[in-house]
């Protein structure tokens, strides 16, 4: 059984060999399934200008049309219950290809892909220095000043941030969900029920946070599905997401879907020798089935009871028109459904359990390299976003693809669902609490580039039916 290790606990030359393998794989032709470029294109490939910034560096560029149309490129699964198993398969075959390249260069026979556990920033048992270190892209991957000379191939141009925002790596909204999926498109750990979905609309909580938000925080190639896998840190990021799935599954009351529509779905890749292979979701339901485990790391399990399944809910209020997101937006008033006409209230639940309240951000369209967006909710006039009314953050990973009608997408944009029950419960303690006076605020974490456009179709607030 192989063991994938925490990158900050490595005591060997794992990253040195990784850098050498990346260099070797970059030297291979883009039409070679074992090349760095082909492996990146499995996740996503495009020829619009911002993507070509990275793709025109590929050996042998442009690829043949036969390669582009082979059915192996642009296969990443997003906004779907296949997100986690597809990326586990993707990492497995990538790791095999890298390990073979390392062996062929005379390296160790047991090389494994490390993981970057940025979630350690939430480990209250860790030292402040270790919490802060966890947020930093490992120094072997270079800095904003350029590559680390000893690991030059682990750097890529245009990364926006080398230190993540702590809010962007919070594992608990996902880890505290009890259900992997549900058929109603409501909040779940692993995503909603779909078919093949290169750009789906049923995003699970783990995909939403930390996955999407880390992508857009680092930005550059990582901020776009059509270039993300060209950044060497992509693979360590996804190893951590893969690890979190395994940690979640080991907790009481959690399980993967049992229906054949999930278990029997198959995807195509290439093995270490560049030969086509097919694998089913049921073959990757645990890491042990693929012959590897992760070293124990935070979080080892949830610290709170699993959230109850999302019950029947009703709209409490919503914005009355679409709106654009700028660098600093004033809070937006929600138009509240008159109390006699709605079946839900923002009141404490009867019988002990707290009511679940969900904030939905729907039909988000746009373009450009967006930064993560912080979300706030308040009941006070002129109250700006602050820690007390912070409810979460979203990353618009795949925004342009989701906004463009195509075979893979209906062009309706991205959708998000955030459980804001805890914040609503806190606000309810205020003397001036008024459930018919609710405002939301969306604030980008950094100044957006001039070519960024973000339009939100609707923000709506949903609560349990009384």
Swiss-Prot record:
Signal sequence region: none
Ways its activity is controlled: Cleavage of the lid-domain increases activity levels, affinity for substrate and turnover rate. Exhibits high saline tolerance.
Temperature dependence: Optimum temperature is approximately 40 degrees Celsius. Maintains 60-50% of activity between 40 and 65 degrees Celsius and retains 30% of activity at 72 degrees Celsius.
Cofactor note: Binds 2 copper ions per subunit.
Binding, Cu cation A: 43, 78, 87
Pfam assignment, any one: Tyrosinase
Binding residues for Cu cation B: 211, 215, 238
Catalytic activity, as annotated: L-tyrosine + O2 = L-dopaquinone + H2O; 2 L-tyrosine + O2 = 2 L-dopa; 2 L-dopa + O2 = 2 L-dopaquinone + 2 H2O
E.C. code: 1.14.18.1
Cofactor entry: Cu(2+)
Keyword Metal-binding: yes
pH-activity dependence text: Optimum pH is between 6 and 8. Exhibits a relatively broad pH range of activities (over 50% of activity between pH 4.5 and 9.5).
GO molecular function, one term: metal ion binding
Enzyme type, top EC level: oxidoreductase
Record keywords: Copper, Metal-binding, Oxidoreductase
PTMs per UniProt: In vitro, the C-terminal lid-domain is slowly cleaved off in an autoprocessive time dependent manner, leading to the formation of cleaved-HcTyr1. The processing rate is not influenced by factors such as pH and added metal ions.
Subunit: Monomer. Formation of a dimer is observed when the protein is in its holo-form.
Listed PANTHER family: SHKT DOMAIN-CONTAINING PROTEIN, TYROSINASE FAMILY MEMBER
Domains (record comment): The latent-HcTyr1 form contains a C-terminal lid-domain (LID), which is hampering substrate accessibility to the active site.
Function of the molecule: Copper-containing oxidase that catalyzes the conversion of L-tyrosine to L-dopa and then to L-dopaquinone. Can use various phenols such as p-coumaric acid, phenol, pyrocatechol, syringol or pyrogallol. Accepts several of the constituents of lignin and potentially participates in lignin functionalization.
Family designation: Belongs to the tyrosinase family.
Name of the featured protein: Tyrosinase HcTyr1
Gene source species: Hahella sp. (strain CCB-MM4)
Classification lineage: Bacteria, Pseudomonadati, Pseudomonadota, Gammaproteobacteria, Oceanospirillales
């Amino acid at each position: 059984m192989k063991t994938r290790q925490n990158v900050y606990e490595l005591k060997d030359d794992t990253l040195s060999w990784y850098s050498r393998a990346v260099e070797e794989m970059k030297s291979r032709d883009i039409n070679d399934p074992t090349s760095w470029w082909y492996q990146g294109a499995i996740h996503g490939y495009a020829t619009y200008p911002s993507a070509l910034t990275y793709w025109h560096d590929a050996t042998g560029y442009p690829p043949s049309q036969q390669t582009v149309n082979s059915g192996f490129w642009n296969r990443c699964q997003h906004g779907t219950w296949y997100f986690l198993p597809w990326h586990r398969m993707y990492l497995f075959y990538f790791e095999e290809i890298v390990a073979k390249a390392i062996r062929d260069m005379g390296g160790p026979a047991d090389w494994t892909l490390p993981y970057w556990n940025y979630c350690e920033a939430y480990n209250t048992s860790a030292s402040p220095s270790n919490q802060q270190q966890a947020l930093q892209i490992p120094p072997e991957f270079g800095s904003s000043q350029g590559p680390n000379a000893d690991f030059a191939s682990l750097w890529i141009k245009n990364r926006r941030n080398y230190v993540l925002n702590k809010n962007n790596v919070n594992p608990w909204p996902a880890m505290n969900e009890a259900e992997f999926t549900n058929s109603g498109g409501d909040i779940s750990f692993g995503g909603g029920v779909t078919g093949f979905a290169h750009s789906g609309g049923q995003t699970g909580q783990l995909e939403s946070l930390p996955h999407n938000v880390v992508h857009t925080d680092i930005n550059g190639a990582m901020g776009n599905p059509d270039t993300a896998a060209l950044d060497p840190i992509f693979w360590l990021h996804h190893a951590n997401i893969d690890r979190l799935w395994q940690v979640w599954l080991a907790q009481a009351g959690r399980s993967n879907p049992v229906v054949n529509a999930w278990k029997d779905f198959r995807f195509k890749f290439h093995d270490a020798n560049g030969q086509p292979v097919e694998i089913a979701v049921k073959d990757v339901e645990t890491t042990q089935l693929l012959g590897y485990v992760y070293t124990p790391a935070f979080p080892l399990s949830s610290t709170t009871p699993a959230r109850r399944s999302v019950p029947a809910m009703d709209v409490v209020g919503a914005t009355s028109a679409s709106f654009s997101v700028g660098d600093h937006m004033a809070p937006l008033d929600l138009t509240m459904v008159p109390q006699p006409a709605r079946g839900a209230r923002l009141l404490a639940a009867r019988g002990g359990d707290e009511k679940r309240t969900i904030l939905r951000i729907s039909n988000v369209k746009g373009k450009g390299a967006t930064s993560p967006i912080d979300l706030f909710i308040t009941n006070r006039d002129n109250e700006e976003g602050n820690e007390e009314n912070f409810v979460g953050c979203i990353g618009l990973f795949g925004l342009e693809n989701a906004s463009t009608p195509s075979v893979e997408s209906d062009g309706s944009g991205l959708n998000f669902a955030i459980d804001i029950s805890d914040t609503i419960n806190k606000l309810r303690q205020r003397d001036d609490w008024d459930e018919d006076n609710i405002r939301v605020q969306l604030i980008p974490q950094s100044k957006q580039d001039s070519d960024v456009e973000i339009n939100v179709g609707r923000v709506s607030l949903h609560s349990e039916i009384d």
